[in-house]
């Protein structure tokens, strides 16, 4: 009878562990082969051994807490002890095959015909218009809705995404597969996670292309609903590489109301004419500063966002909407410096509502059927 009870308890514990999600891979630890052993005592004490992917796993404390909490909630258990071990090279190889398939060369999942991930390349003409701020806030707002979101900091020379997302974690590497850190429920990858301190990255075009290719192919993104790429300003090497590596990526153009900035933003959007990309819309940032008396000061002028949308619509022969106008507010700057996007810290503010509205519009869109395999054979009846 004791053996039966122990077997029932072990089964209940394993079921509970099946609900423990690995914080990096976002899959149950039982499915990933991370449960090494479960031992129970006659008094209900439990000893669970867990495999970590690498010895210096940055999430080992979080995994231990999740396992302990899950086992402690199982009826009939008393004291819970969790021990950690490390996967062997063979186990890591099997894990990589399980996640990525037994492919010799990594592929870019978002460029495959059957990919359902929406890819938005956030572009601007000039620097300093708030492109990265818009990117992180849209990502966080989408994640709040329960979507699986990733952000790729493609601005290699001017990287700022980790700081604005409040993460200093480094990626975990399992063989050639890179596991991106997660901040505010968003997967984040940036060259800043591979450099020391504020070291500048001094690379030319071919190196930039290779880095972008590795971020897209070697990083294990999982099943994303939306991937946001924070592009560098202008129409240089990275923008061209994105069009080559992910032809289905759609452009989101960020500008300020200033006409000079709008003209440059128009050039950044017009790259779509040469790369055959779709422009999903325009976002106007720093639209106006609300004063204490309720009036609005147009610090950077007005009309730039609408002008860009109208001119791009004429250029591409399709509607390019002005998706939103984000007010100028020091709180948005402070939120970026603190590492907590404003859509999370002040969701009910005017800026928060506008950003959430833009995110809603982008989240509810579905990828078109162009380039996708429908699994139909016209020769069969």
Curated annotation (Swiss-Prot):
InterPro entries: FSCA_dom_sf, MIP18-like, Mrp-like_CS, Mrp/NBP35_ATP-bd, NUBPL-like, P-loop_NTPase, YlxH/NBP35. It holds the Pfam family FeS_assembly_P. GO terms for biological process: iron-sulfur cluster assembly. The keyword Hydrolase applies. ATP binds at residues 125-132. Keywords: ATP-binding, Hydrolase, Iron, Iron-sulfur, Metal-binding, Nucleotide-binding. SUPFAM superfamilies: Fe-S cluster assembly (FSCA) domain-like, P-loop containing nucleoside triphosphate hydrolases. GO terms for molecular function: 4 iron, 4 sulfur cluster binding; ATP binding; ATP hydrolysis activity; ATP-dependent FeS chaperone activity; metal ion binding. CDD domains: Mrp_NBP35. It comes from the Bacteria. Was identified as a high-confidence drug target. In the N-terminal section; belongs to the MIP18 family. Homodimer. Binds and transfers iron-sulfur (Fe-S) clusters to target apoproteins. Can hydrolyze ATP. This is Iron-sulfur cluster carrier protein. It comes from Mycobacterium tuberculosis (strain ATCC 25618 / H37Rv). The lineage of its organism: Bacteria, Bacillati, Actinomycetota, Actinomycetes, Mycobacteriales.
């Amino acid at each position: 009878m004791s053996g039966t009870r122990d077997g029932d308890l072990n089964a209940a514990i394993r079921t509970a562990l099946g609900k423990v999600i690995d914080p990096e891979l976002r899959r149950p630890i039982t499915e990933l082969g991370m449960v090494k052993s479960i031992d129970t005592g006659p008094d209900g004490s439990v000893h669970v051994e867990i495999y970590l992917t690498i010895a210096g796993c940055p999430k080992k404390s979080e995994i231990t807490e999740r396992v302990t909490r899950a086992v402690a909630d199982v009826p009939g258990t008393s004291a819970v002890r969790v021990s950690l071990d490390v996967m062997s090279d063979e186990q890591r190889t099997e894990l990589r095959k399980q996640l990525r398939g037994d492919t010799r060369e990594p592929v870019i999942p978002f460029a495959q015909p059957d990919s359902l991930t929406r890819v938005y390349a956030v572009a601007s003409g000039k620097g300093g218009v708030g492109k990265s701020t818009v990117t992180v806030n849209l990502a966080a707002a989408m994640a709040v809705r329960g979507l699986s979101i990733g952000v790729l900091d493609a601005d290699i020379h001017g990287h700022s995404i980790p700081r604005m997302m409040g993460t200093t974690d480094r990626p975990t590497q399992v063989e050639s597969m890179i596991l991106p850190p997660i901040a505010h429920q968003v997967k984040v990858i940036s060259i800043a996670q591979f450099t020391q301190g504020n070291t500048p990255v001094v690379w030319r075009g071919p190196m930039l292309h290779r880095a972008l290719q590795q971020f897209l192919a070697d990083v294990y993104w999982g099943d994303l609903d939306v991937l946001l790429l924070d592009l560098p300003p202008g129409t240089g090497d990275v923008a061209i590489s994105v069009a080559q590596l992910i032809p289905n990526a759609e452009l989101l153009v960020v500008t300020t109301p200033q006409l000079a900035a709008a003209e440059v933003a128009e050039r950044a959007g017009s790259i779509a004419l040469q790369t055959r990309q779709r422009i999903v819309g325009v976002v106007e940032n720093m639209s106006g500063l609300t004063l204490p008396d309720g009036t609005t000061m147009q610090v950077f002028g007005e009309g730039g966002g609408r002008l860009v949308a109208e001119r791009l619509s004429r250029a591409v022969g399709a509607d390019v909407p002005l998706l939103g106008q984000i007010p100028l507010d020091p709180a948005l700057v402070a939120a970026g410096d603190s590492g907590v996007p404003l859509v999370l810290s002040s969701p009910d503010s005017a800026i928060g509502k506008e950003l959430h509205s833009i995110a809603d519009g982008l989240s509810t869109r579905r990828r078109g059927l162009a380039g996708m395999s429908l699994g139909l054979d016209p020769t069969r009846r």
